Amino acid sequence: MDPESIGQPWGDAVEGVLTFRGSPTRSWYGKGPVPENPISVWSFPENNRMCSMTSISGVSEQWCGMGWTGQPAIFKYEEETWLIFGAYDSKVHFVNAQTGERLLPDFPTGDIIKGSVTVDPDGFPLVYVGSRDNYLRILSFDGEEPRELWKVHAYDFSPTKWNNDWDSSPLVIDDYLFAAGENSRFHIFHLNRSYDLEGRVVVSPELVTDFPGWDEELISDVGSNVSIETSPLILGDTLYFANSGGLVQGWDIAGLSEGIEPTRVFRFWAGDDVDATIVPDDEGYLYVGVEYERATQRSKEIGQIIKLDPSNPEDPLVWSVEDRPYLNSGIWATPAIYEDLVIFPTDQGKVHGIDRITGDIRWTLELSGKAWSSPAIVDGVMVLGDCSGQLRAFDLSDTSIAPPQLWRVRTEGCIEATAVIWEGTVYAGSRDGFLYAFRDFIQ
């Protein structure tokens, strides 16, 4: 993907926000206008909450709603605007974006869905979705009900480390599927998408390559918790991702179609868990948010908000900012770039507007709860949720000052999922069990 595509929609075959942060550069948030004084016009489901049981460290718990990263995909298909999203009821949902009504029956998986789905960018009626049931799936939505066309298990690959969920949002480029797993490996499949004689979409994925997201130096530094929860970023011919061991890496994929194996061309150890997705700017610099969990000496030296220059692999650190007020703090939200700023929400509930060139904090907002939701910015308006259950909009028109709040709406649960903005409506999932549509009230 050309750096000039940063901030642009993902091609022109399908109109919409098709994956977490909208594009392979993770830099497109939706389409305006942004509502000016919104109310909740519908919530999904209409009655029962989206809840199911899941096991955390061997203890069964009920989880509800939508969580991190939880951004719905929204797109135009057959004269309707669709929302597709996974939730903590362990199902994939297919919903009319205007009315909140089901377009297709729910598709059940075996455990909760934390990540954001990816809709095929080339117009095939396909959605790519991972679950905590250890499977990455391809579903079709061209019939009266969704069909499972393919699935792969996290332990179909070896060796693996740490875990077996699929929280990362995959990418599809030139009939290749790029998918990261909490099995700590990265996987590339040739999809072989087509249609059968009845006109229904089919796939026949073949594994092209898979490789570990760790190396022995990383295991020596931090141990085996090196799962990949970040969503992959593709910039030019380089694939970037990071892992729970804090290893930020770039892989050359230029020769993929000629059968040339990807090779690692960039390595930087951030010192601690990186779950937030890496974000590039139009000059090719990378912005990385790091958690503070292990209290390593490296994380104390490097900081939790980092700008890297991958064109200088021997000394890539441009600047860094410390954000470690307590153990298990730092950054979970994916940053957003707007004009001369990079914006980082924090676990402490602060939002830093940072000068992209100097690394100086220009302003800081104080929210009412931890901020794991990633900012969505359309038409100079930033929409962001927090764990007090509030979704707020801020005016970014003057980047030199703290942005004034334009409006806020409230849900009954933590908003750690990322919102999507589309043609006058903001869609956001909450841990209270519902997905909400907020738009201006029109009499």
Q: Which functions belong to the PLM regions below?
A:
Residues 1-13, 20, 26-69, 73-167, ...:
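Extracytoplasmic/lumenal domain signature
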